[in-house]
Amino acid sequence: MLKDIHQHRILILDFSSQYAQLIARRVREIGVYCELMPCDIDEETIRDFNPHGIILSGGPETVTLSHTLRAPAFIFEIGCPVLGICYGMQTMAYQLGGKVNRTAKAEFGHAQLRVLNPAFLFDGIEDQVSPQGEPLLDVWMSHGDIVSELPPGFEATACTDNSPLAAMADFKRRFFGLQFHPEVTHTPQGHRILAHFVIHICQCIPNWTTKHIIEDSIRDIQEKVGKEQVIVGLSGGVDSAVTATLVHKAIGDQLVCVLVDTGLLRLNEVDEVLNVFQKHLGAKVICVDAKDRFMKALKGISDPEEKRKIAGEQFIRVFEEQAKKLNVKWLGQGTIYPDVIESAKTKTGKGHIIKTHHNVGGLPLNMELKLIEPLRELFKDEVRKLGLELGLPADLIYRHPFPGPGLAIRILGEVNAEYINILKQADAIFIEELKKSDYYHQVSQAFAVFMPLKSVGVKGDARHYGYIIALRAVKTVDFMTAQWADLPHEFLSKVSHRIVNEIKEVSRVVYDMTNKPPATIEWE
């Protein structure tokens, strides 16, 4: 019997927290569907979503300032359990009649939490026990404000040396507040605390599993498509691979895969992708040579957003032409949840655009094909789990992500054939050395970036002006936040040496040491 994977659901209201997506991932790991929405979402949208519980994220603001964000007041009146985390706890306390003040000593980092009342959230959870027999937890703090006076109906359920009210609860109304961050790995018992809220307090049934997601996706594809054909664009990445596999599992020979050779793929990628999909998927694969088309469309374009939109436009036009030849009505795309969030295309359209993804905001408005996006609700780690469950090879599943517009957004400014050729070679050297040194699977994404600037160097006995190549490698789980990869200097030196010696047009190699945030993973 098919499970309704969306029946039990948690709503996360985001107060611009750097950890908001991490909260969502933790809830998904518990096995319950959740969505992330802006904290100023309208009442109708929340009621339509019909959550079993609501989580208020942390945030960078100070609650007591008049202009700062507030939780929608009605959520405290609908009988739904609410969990406030950090800023979320503070705004809940403030809005319900408590007091919030600046703390004399801000807490950032590790703290030891003393549990005063373990009921519900802390039941059976401890890292240590105090001499008085009280449960002690190691937690991660990041705050400069504290709840100084509880709202009516609340009691203190935990404290730290610097925060007498480090956790609070109104058991009757099922409102809970945590001053610390249970979603981060630095709070070892955080997963269990969130599970207590989601499973025991909100009484959600954990139906959000890989097996159930696959079953639901197949059913959804079959119901939407019927007997019609679907065209899926392949890029060599995990998202398009899992999309194609899901669609193929749902409708079999009604699927036609199209690999568009844009001229902007990595070195030898066209042959590699064709080999993988014809061997492992057994689906019909058409390769379209569109190199001239893409180069002509991108000529003279330097703006990153324009390049993304042009790439999206050209992809769709190629697919539409192939679809007309084959009488196909549907386009399957590997859009995933982080694409949706970053493109600010949530269900309400609210949010600030970080960058437009070519398969979200970059799609033309007059597109003739109907869209099917089976991965749209999934984070990258969930997509990979699906791929493994579907039997795709691990090398493909854990291949580093590659953007839809390809090397066009790894070349700063205008794209031309010379720049593409240089970048392909540099990127291939970097990836080859990562694999030879067994670092490839220790980082989540790695690539080279071409900078159309010339820097002076010396080759032989002569001065040499050549281009600059930047190397980027990051570690991440969900691609919403990322840390730059601290690769050994000896390794980076070897890669740099090869690039400047094997590519005569390059005179300098630099390494990007910026996290996300503040930077994005891609340079454009």
Curated annotation (Swiss-Prot):
Its EC number is 6.3.5.2. Keywords: ATP-binding, Glutamine amidotransferase, GMP biosynthesis, Ligase, Nucleotide-binding, Purine biosynthesis. ATP binds at S235, G236, G237, V238, D239, S240, A241. One of its GO terms (molecular function) is ATP binding. It holds the Pfam family GMP_synt_C. One of its GO terms (cellular component) is cytosol. The active site is at C86, H181, E183. The keyword Ligase applies. It catalyses: XMP + L-glutamine + ATP + H2O = GMP + L-glutamate + AMP + diphosphate + 2 H(+). Residues 208-399 form the GMPS ATP-PPase domain. It is an enzyme of class 6 (ligase). Pathway: Purine metabolism; GMP biosynthesis; GMP from XMP (L-Gln route): step 1/1. Homodimer. Catalyzes the synthesis of GMP from XMP. This is GMP synthase [glutamine-hydrolyzing]. The lineage of its organism: Bacteria, Pseudomonadati, Pseudomonadota, Gammaproteobacteria, Legionellales. The gene is guaA.
